[in-house]
Structures are given as C-alpha cells and as structure tokens.
Amino acid sequence: MESSMFKPSSMDLIRAGLQDLDRARALFGQLKADAIADGRCAELLGVLAHACDPDVALGNFVDIVNAMQSSRRDLDRVIPDAGALRRLITVLGASDAMGKFMRFRPELVEAASVGSADSHLFNRAQRRARLLMAVGADPDDQAMPVASKDLAEAATALRAGYRRQLAAIIAQDVMAEDPIRIQPTISSELSDLADAALEGALAIARHETEGNEHVRFTIIGMGKLGAQELNYVSDVDLIYVVEPADKDVDHQTLIRVGTKMGTMLQRVCQSVIMGVAEQPLWQIDGGLRPEGKDGALVRVLSSHKNYYEQWAENWEFQALLKARPVAGDPDLGQAYMDMSRPFVWSASKRKNFVYDCQKMRKRVEDLIPAPLKDREIKLGRGGLRDVEFTVQMLQLVHGRTDESLRTSNTLDSLQRLSEGGYVSRKQAVRMSQDYRFERVMEHRQQIWSLKRTHLFPDLGRASVGGLEKKRDIDVDELNQNQELRRLARAFGLHPEELVDKYDDTRREVRHLHLDIYYRPMLPVNAQMENDQIVLSVEAAQERFESIGFGDPDAAIRHVQALTAGVGRAAKINRIILPAVLQWLGEGQNPDMGLLNWRKLEENFGTESGYLGFLRDSTSAAQRLCHILSNSRFLGDALNKSVESISWLGDDGNLQARTREALDVQTGSALERFGSNINEFATSMRAMRRHEIERIGLSWMSGVISDSDSLKAMTDVYDAIIDASLTWAVRHQIAAFGVETAPAGITVIAMGRYGGREVNFSSDADAILIYRPADDADDGQANAFAKKVVEDLRNILQGPTTLEPKIELDLDLRPEGKNGPLVRSYASCEEYYESWASTWERQALLRARYAAGDAELARDFLINIADPLRYPTAELTEAELQNIRKLKARMEAERLPRGVRRERHLKLGKGGLSDVEWTVQLMQLQHAGDIKDLRVNGTLEALDVLEAKKLISAIDAIQLRKTWTLCTAARNGNYLWSGRANQADILPDDIYSLGGIAVYLGYGAHRGQHFENDLLAVMRKCRDVCQRLFYGQTEGEATAAATATASAATPQPQTAPRPRMHVIAPRLERNRRRAQR
C-alpha cells in the first residue's frame, strides 16, 4: 500500500459534512499508510458526505480499522471495494451503537459492508433455519426443534446470529435511495428476524426443560410483531398457548412444563445469562395475555376461549386483530387463530366497542407528559397510533361483513379499505405516505443507539407546538442541534425543513382521521373532494352504529337534512359535521345530540349566526356536542335561547353572575313591568331558567365547581325572590291606597335554600314573617301581608305564565301546613317559645335572611332562632330519641312508593339526609359552646366539626364525599333527564346511570361503574351515620352495613369471575398497556 499520509483540506472536510475539523484531521492522521492507502482515504472522504453523522462515522471507522490492525485482520478482505466502504460508512453514520459493536465483531462489519453476506436477502424460512442451526437444532423439524448446545453457548450463538442479520438489515435500510418506499419491507424483515429468534429461543427452552417432548407449544405474536411491522428496538408482545403432545399428560404437568419453557424462552431473549457476553435482544411483554401480567403465563386453547367469551374487555378484541403465530407448533398456532378470529370480527357489535377504544386512545394521549406531547412520534396526536387506530376501527366495523378487510398489517389493511370503497384512493395514498414517513423517523431514532425510543429530537423551547399553535423556532438553534441535524440528513432535508414536514404530517394525519372515518357518513352531495368515497347504506349504518347511534337510519336522515341545499347553514354543516359526529359519539346519547343539533338549525339556522361561530370556535362546538348528547334539559333550553351558545366560546361568559349583576336585571324588570304581574312573573321565571342554563352549561363545561354552582343557584333564587317581594309590596301599597307599607315583610330561607345549597331542581323552602309598621294596626298589617304573599306566590308559582314555576315551599313554617302562610313576628315569638318541637329547632339551623325587611330578619334570627338552634344546655335523651324517631318516620313516609331505600339519593340509606341530620345533630349539641359551628351550610359545619376534633378525619371525609357525590348526582340526573320529580331517584337502568355518571367525571357508558362506586360510598356513609347519629357501636354499625351490602348485591347467575386479585389491578394494567 502507499506510504504517504493523506491530508485533506478544510474545504474537503466541510464538503464531506464534517463539523469538528481538527478532530477529523487527527483521525485521518491515525489511518497509517499500512492500514489504508491514500486512494482509500479519498474514497472514505467522498462517502462520508452520505452519512447522517459524518463525524461519528469517521470516528467509529478509525476505531474499527485500529481494532482490525491489532487483531491482524485483512481490511481489504472485509472492505474490498468502494461500494462496501460506502455501505459501512452509511451504517456507522446512522448507528453509533452498531459502530461500537463492530469494533470487536468483524462479522458485523462484513454483514453490513459486504454483499456476499447476503443475510438481508434471506426469506423467513432461511432466517429461521440459520438461527436454529446456530443453536444446534434441526431446521427441518417444523413443530418441535430442540437445541443441542448448552444454555450459554446456544444463547451466545443465537444473539450473535441475530445481530449479524440485524446489521445487514440496517445497511439495506440506510442505503436505500427511498427509505420511505421500502419501510414496509424493512419492518417485515425485522419481524421475520424476530420470529426466527423466538424459534431459536424456544428450541433452547426445550433443551433446558425436562418433559418438553410432552408439550405442544406455540407463540402468538401481538402488536407490531403480529402485524409484521416491528421496529428495530421494541418490546415484543407475546401470548403462549400449550396443548398436550400425548394423551398421558395431565393438565397440571402440562401447565408446569409449559410455564418453565415460557420462562426459559423469555430469559434467553431478555435476561443477562452467566457465561453469555452478548447483550439481550429485546424485552418480552406478556401483558396482552388473558388477565394480563396477573394471569397464567401459559394456557391451553380452551382456557383462552373461555376468557374471551366471558371476561375480555373491548380493547382486548382490538388487540387480537394483530395476533399471528410466530413460532412453535404451527398447527396449534392455526388452531388459536381459528378460535380467536370470530371474536375479532364480531367485536364491533359489542356494547360501546368503538367508544371504549376511542377512550383508550385518548387516555394514552393524556398520559404523555406535557413536554413530550409534541415530540411523540408514536403515541402523540397525529402520530403512528392515530393512523393505526383509524385503520383498525374501519376494519373492525366493516370487517364483520366484508372478509376482504381481515388483515393485520396496517398498510395492507389500508390498501384493502381503499379497494373496498371505504377509503378514497387519494386518502389511502396520503395516509400511507404519512405513516411510512413517521415510521422511518422512528426507526432512525432507534438505530442510532439501538434503544427503544419514539421521540422526535428535543428542540428546547421549540419542542412545544406544531399542531394548534406554531413552534417558537430559531433556525440557527436548529442548525446547532446535532440530533435534529442527523435525522434531517437521513431524509436529505435541512433541520427546519424536517420540523415543518413532521408538523405537516401530524396535522394531515389528524385531519385524515376525520375525513376517512366521519366524512363518508355524510351523503354524496355533502362531500368536499371529487374522489371522496360514498358508503353503501349498509356500510353507513354500520359506521353510525359503531360510534354509538342507536337508530342509524334516523341519524342518516338527520345528516341528509342538515347538509341538503345551497344555504349557508348547509354549507357550514358540510364542513363541521364530521367533527360533530365524532364529538356526539363520545356522549351518552348521540341520537339525542344529533336530533338537538338539527332542531337548533331548524329553529335558528336561517336567522342566527351561531353555526358560523361554531365553525370558527372548535372548543365551543365540542362543548356544545358534549351538552347536546348528555343533557335533555339543556338541549331543550338551548332551543329556546340560541344566544346562549355564544357563551360556550368564552369561559368568562359562563361564569356565574354576581348578586349585583342579578339585582341590576331584576331592578330593570321591576321598572319595566311594575304594573303587569304576568309580564313580571314571566321575566322572573325566564331569568331563573336562563341562569340555570348558564350555570348548567358552565358546570358541564368544567368552568365552575360543584359548590360554586350551588351558591350561584342560591344567588339566583335570592335575587328573584327579593325582586318578587318588592314588586308585591309596591303593588299592594298602591292597592291599599297608602304611601308606605303597613307592615315589613321578610323571607327567611330554610332547608337547602337556607344552607345556600340550591340545586337545579330545588324548591325554595322558606318562612314568611311580617311586623306591623309603627303607625299601622295589626288587622291592616295582617291583611296587607296576606295580599303581598298572595302576589309573591302568584309571581313565583301561579298560573300567570307558561314559564316553569319556582316552588316556594312554606311547609317548615310554624304549625306546618296547618299554620298561616305568613305570620307576625310576635306570633312567631310566642309559637317558638311555647310550642316549638325539637325538629323545628333543628330546622332553624338552616334559617338565614333571604329577602325583604333585613332588620326584621335579623331580629327573628337573633332573638328567636339563635336561642333555639344554638342551645347552651345539652340535649336530653328524650330529645335525642325524638330526633331519631322523626328522621326514621320522615324517611318512611316521604320515600316514594316502589323506590328501594338504597336508590334514593336524599332519603335513602347513606344519602343526603343521613349526612345532613348527622351534622345538624352535632350542631345542636355543640353550637351553643362553639360559635364557629353557627353556620348554615352542611359542608361548612362539617369542616368545623372536623377542625374541632368532634368528628374524626376519616368520618368527615366519608360524609363529605357522600354529600358531594349525591348532590352532584341529583344535579346530573336533572340535567340528563329534564325531570325534576325524578332527580332524587337513582335509576335502575345502566343507560340512564351512564347519563348521570358523565356529570361526575366518568366517561359515557360507565353507568355500572358509577352505580357501584356511589352505592359503596353510600353504604360507608350509612355506617358512619349509624354510629354518630343513631349511637350504635362500631360493631353494630359494621354488622348493619354488611347486611345492607349483602341485600343490595345481586347473586351471580353465571360462572364465577376470575380471582379478585386479578380483577383489582386491571385499570392499572390497562393504563400500562395503553402506553405501548
């Protein structure tokens, strides 16, 4: 070889893409004349320009040359020509990890650089044969090949043979002129290589396991391996199936031997083994097997079938779509496929199947840490999982009736969907291109360090954005980002061009999901593109059914009506309906939502600009769909006042109005309708309806909390009742022909109204009191007060208007229903002093000023109510028994006929009544000494009781949780059903329970989960109530709670469920599984 030293110029080094010029000169200087000639150095300099990272490629190459020189290996034999050199340098520039492996493994250099290695041209059978021979097994044995080498030698040979083929695949990939085009081929070859490695590992496991000849063992690949779209570095999802190889094997022996084989197989693939220098291949994940990681490692075929028939959740059938026998007994593998396919292709008919899968997908997105959301190539929005999800949902929905769609590979399936008319050709091409591009990016990131990753390079502050908002990009900073520069060079792009292409791809994938899944649900006249496909009637019905529509024919008619014509509303609907259908499908009742959407257009579409507003405000449109598909009450309310829709675009408009703002509105009504009771009543009741609508919309949208919604509703009642009393007083002053009122009149709020806990369906409990003016006689004052109250009640609940009544409940007044509606202050004083019962003292705990004469209210509360409700003397045993008996009698008498005790949110066992009476009893016992307890609200009093150590923290938490849940459930029940008379009753049907559950933070169709959770909380509350209110010992209360729970729990009618320790961690298992 030539002896002169090769000395490239700075310009030569820059043209080659090298950045550290001093280091590059030093490295070229290390290439001694007897190692590589000047001509070869020139070739090297020329091929470095093709490397993703020329600096790293040069450094690794020099290390490899030095290692070969030290071991006296012939460099020209390993790298015989310029083509081999370019191949090697391209690999070294793309994979720093493989370069480090190659320093001490010349066979990897040969595999990557020399075409004669030919391992990248292996087919599946040849790969299997090569790795089986490496472990000393017979490749011609298709069912049960057994290794002949000991564990350490076989594992070393298997791992080394795997990496030799992996190096050749990497070389094939990075040398491709168009890596995006050949991406499916690369994933297929990686999958074939993994299949072969698993076959080899199973052969080793047979060698290491006594009795293996009695066990038929097959490996089912799931996820990317099953779909033959494996990455370079990825967990491998597997399921193991065993059957006896002969009749003499009992089940226990079969499972024991099979488990040993499965454990050894996994150890060979993923664990450090003594005497084995080669690194493990990849991690094996068995989480997709029945019962997940808590289930048996191996099962017989019938056990798999039994699980899928009885216990599998919806997402597990989606996962089965990717199942494929990858190694082991081929006949048993086929038997598994024959067993599982019917489950896969009937899955879309399972209840809430698509909804559950969508929620799983959404949960995955939500679990991504905020700094990584826009870097996640796989799991992020617009990433690989979005493409896979779109394709899988279409397959599962339409594959039930169209067998041509029954494939597992994403791109093959996308092509079949296009050929079948479910996806347009143009959409299929775009989605396929996007998927391949993101896959190549993911592969390039993994190749570099041969570690599992699917993150786009860290761009610092520019890492956030790219979808809804632009990234904060500095081009100079991007050019300094070595990781980004390396990845961009793999595509022949500048760094900023790669960032733009990545973001464009994500946006297109997100858009294509809507276009592909939802736009074809619109009729042909509503399509936006020339090549848009038109679904058959059957396919359209299947798609509407899949997203939760109970009456797909009606839904199709609604969509046709909404998109027909050339009007502005129809044009806007054609644009936004695909997204609207998706959002409605996420609700409990999509049919109701779409019907309400159509009603809005029929009522206001030609006169209001609300559709244009929704087109321009995605958040408002999504909120509206959530409301229309989950609330009958608010759907009806919006159809009466479409201007409320504009509130949904601004959280400020959804905030509850202050008392001052409410008083301004009532004051205006007083001035405008001072002489017309019908119009004034209409304005007050409409105001209440309007504010319920505002607060309901705000509560459903998560803008205000549960407690804020109760306080806001109380303010609305106070403002309306105060204004109504003012109107009535003014009207009667005129009617009596006097200048001033003969009596002052006040409204004392009682019950939940007094506690500022008004819900959407509440009455207003109150006591009305008057006191004669200084110059008025009692008779005139009494007559005046009666007339005022008559007007007040007419305004609030009389037949003066079609607006819903505001019930003013006066049953808590002295003498109850037998007493006068309005009573003088003196009469109240005499009554409470002489005749007040214990329960009336308790009821006064809620008393507060609401409207009217504030001084009169203050005198009543301080002089009459306070001594009774905050007594200094302890309650006697007789008084305690009286309260307890009264509570029991009230619940028995007021509980509606036919309603079970545990189903009533207010009067039922563990319901609101239990919490409130328990707290109020303790107020009666301690508020005389503790001034902080002199509050009207339940939770405020409970907080004080806990702070003063009068109740344990555990009991306080239980009472607080129950009260909050039951109150929210009442509100949710009312908004869901629109029926005030049913708001206190927990429905029996799971569907209606699901509608209520949405308001408590559950997803749609989670009625059973909500019911179980709520009833469990109420049972625990009842236990606390038994101890604190009824005075039972802890043992007595526990026994009573156990009896209640047993009575409320239906007996199983089917085979026993799997072990409870398996069921308990299922939610956590689902979360882990969703992240893959």
Curated annotation (Swiss-Prot):
<dbReference type="InterPro" id="IPR023057">
    <property type="entry name" value="GlnE"/>
</dbReference>
<dbReference type="GO" id="GO:0008882">
    <property type="term" value="F:[glutamate-ammonia-ligase] adenylyltransferase activity"/>
</dbReference>
<keyword id="KW-0548">Nucleotidyltransferase</keyword>
<dbReference type="Pfam" id="PF08335">
    <property type="entry name" value="GlnD_UR_UTase"/>
</dbReference>
<dbReference type="GO" id="GO:0005829">
    <property type="term" value="C:cytosol"/>
</dbReference>
<dbReference type="InterPro" id="IPR005190">
    <property type="entry name" value="GlnE_rpt_dom"/>
</dbReference>
<keyword id="KW-0547">Nucleotide-binding</keyword>
<dbReference type="GO" id="GO:0000820">
    <property type="term" value="P:regulation of glutamine family amino acid metabolic process"/>
</dbReference>
<dbReference type="GO" id="GO:0005524">
    <property type="term" value="F:ATP binding"/>
</dbReference>
<feature type="region of interest" description="Adenylyl transferase">
    <location>
        <begin position="524"/>
        <end position="1076"/>
    </location>
</feature>
<dbReference type="InterPro" id="IPR043519">
    <property type="entry name" value="NT_sf"/>
</dbReference>
<comment type="similarity">
    <text>Belongs to the GlnE family.</text>
</comment>
<keyword id="KW-0511">Multifunctional enzyme</keyword>
<feature type="region of interest" description="Adenylyl removase">
    <location>
        <begin position="1"/>
        <end position="521"/>
    </location>
</feature>
<keyword id="KW-0067">ATP-binding</keyword>
<comment type="function">
    <text>Involved in the regulation of glutamine synthetase GlnA, a key enzyme in the process to assimilate ammonia. When cellular nitrogen levels are high, the C-terminal adenylyl transferase (AT) inactivates GlnA by covalent transfer of an adenylyl group from ATP to specific tyrosine residue of GlnA, thus reducing its activity. Conversely, when nitrogen levels are low, the N-terminal adenylyl removase (AR) activates GlnA by removing the adenylyl group by phosphorolysis, increasing its activity.</text>
</comment>
<dbReference type="InterPro" id="IPR013546">
    <property type="entry name" value="PII_UdlTrfase/GS_AdlTrfase"/>
</dbReference>
<keyword id="KW-0808">Transferase</keyword>
<feature type="compositionally biased region" description="Low complexity">
    <location>
        <begin position="1041"/>
        <end position="1056"/>
    </location>
</feature>
<dbReference type="GO" id="GO:0000287">
    <property type="term" value="F:magnesium ion binding"/>
</dbReference>
<keyword id="KW-0460">Magnesium</keyword>
<feature type="region of interest" description="Disordered">
    <location>
        <begin position="1041"/>
        <end position="1076"/>
    </location>
</feature>
<dbReference type="GO" id="GO:0047388">
    <property type="term" value="F:[glutamine synthetase]-adenylyl-L-tyrosine phosphorylase activity"/>
</dbReference>
<protein>
    <recommendedName>
        <fullName>Bifunctional glutamine synthetase adenylyltransferase/adenylyl-removing enzyme</fullName>
        <ecNumber>2.7.7.89</ecNumber>
        <ecNumber>2.7.7.42</ecNumber>
    </recommendedName>
</protein>
<dbReference type="Pfam" id="PF03710">
    <property type="entry name" value="GlnE"/>
</dbReference>
